[in-house]
């Protein structure tokens, strides 16, 4: 249950994200400076996580960290989209480097330093703290992304980032929004338990093997503009959802014996699953939001996915893991 509670902390970050973004990034301060400050503060909190003794002391630090971290998911998208003329073609070429970072982290932890199984997991927080501070300092070098100038006094609705809720009046976007919540319920199981599941099955260097999913993600994100251009956003999202369903079937029947190919294929499917649903969904949200509420809209979809959907998923995953 404590594992579920730890992962669930990102829910509260996702809830606060639209408020932080709607109040600050869309109105008052340069987005890249907010991003820098959050990552630097986050580095300090991650260091405190590494030295915390017991879950009672660990949880407050990870909770505050996630409240600060979750808005960055929308902020980086907002900063990127503001610099682009055609996000559907340009964004995947930028987003792919986040995937490269994920691959490097998995390989370093699994094959490089062996922190995955050597009872030295606190070192991952040391490394994360250093990287977070470094990312914060680097964020100051990002292109200047000021809020859109306006002479109007903000309403409470605008301050809370609630204007992005107008997107839900569009029935097609509402379907996408609800689908995002639903698909993130089983996704929470994958995020929380996939590595534990593979290790319990006896797969060696599970974290390293799981980087195949990120390699796949890097390849498919580069193909995403071609797919979007040829088939459109609707078919792209449907393919992404179908890939998630197939993936869980493969994990259900896979093992480290003759059916190990099912586990490997399920991991490799991550590229289609993530890029064709989540990345294309971010592009779709940016397109539907209009110029004024781009950051708040990204916060809204973060609330649906990393907030509501993941909350339900982590609650269920935590209880099932404890059974």
Spell out what each predicted region is.
Residues 1-14, 172-211, 278:
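Helix-loop boundary and gating motifs at the non-cytosolic
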Residues 16-30, 113-114, 219-233, 321-322:
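Helix-to-loop junctions at the C-terminal end of transmembrane segments
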Residues 45, 55-75, 181, 261-276:
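Hydrophobic core of transmembrane alpha-helices in multi-pass small-molecule transporters
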Residues 70-85, 276-290:
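Intracellular juxtamembrane helix-capping segments at the cytosolic ends
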Residues 142-178:
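Juxtamembrane intracellular "pre-TM" segments in multi-pass secondary transporters
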């Amino acid at each position: 249950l404590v594992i579920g509670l730890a992962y669930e902390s990102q829910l509260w970050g996702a809830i606060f994200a639209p408020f932080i973004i709607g109040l600050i990034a869309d109105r008052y301060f340069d987005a890249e400076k907010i991003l820098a400050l959050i990552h630097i503060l986050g580095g300090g909190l991650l260091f405190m996580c590494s030295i915390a003794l017991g879950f009672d002391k660990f949880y407050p630090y990870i909770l505050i960290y996630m409240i600060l971290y979750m808005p960055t998911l929308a902020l980086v998208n907002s900063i990127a989209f503001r610099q682009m003329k055609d996000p559907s073609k340009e964004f995947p070429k930028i987003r792919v480097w986040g995937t490269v970072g994920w691959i490097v982290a998995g390989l370093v932890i699994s094959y490089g330093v062996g922190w995955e199984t050597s009872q030295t997991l606190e070192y991952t927080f040391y490394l994360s703290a250093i990287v977070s501070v470094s990312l914060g300092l680097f964020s100051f070098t990002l292109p200047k992304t000021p809020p859109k100038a306006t002479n109007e006094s903000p309403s409470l609705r605008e301050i809370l980032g609630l204007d992005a809720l107008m997107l839900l009046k569009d029935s097609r976007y509402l379907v996408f929004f609800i689908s995002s919540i639903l698909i993130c319920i089983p996704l929470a199981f994958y995020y929380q338990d996939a590595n534990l599941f593979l290790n319990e099955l006896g797969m060696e260097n599970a974290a390293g093997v799981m980087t195949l999913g990120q390699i796949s993600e890097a390849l498919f994100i580069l193909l995403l503009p071609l797919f979007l251009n040829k088939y459109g956003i609707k078919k792209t999202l449907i393919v992404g959802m179908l890939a998630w369903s197939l993936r869980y079937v493969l994990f259900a029947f896979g093992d480290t014996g003759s059916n190990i190919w099912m586990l490997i294929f399920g991991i490799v499917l991550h590229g289609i699953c993530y890029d064709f649903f989540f990345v294309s969904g971010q592009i779709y949200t940016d397109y539907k939001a209009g110029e004024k509420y781009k950051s708040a809209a990204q916060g809204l979809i973060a609330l649906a996915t990393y907030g509501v959907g993941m909350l339900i998923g982590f609650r269920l995953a935590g209880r099932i893991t404890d059974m």
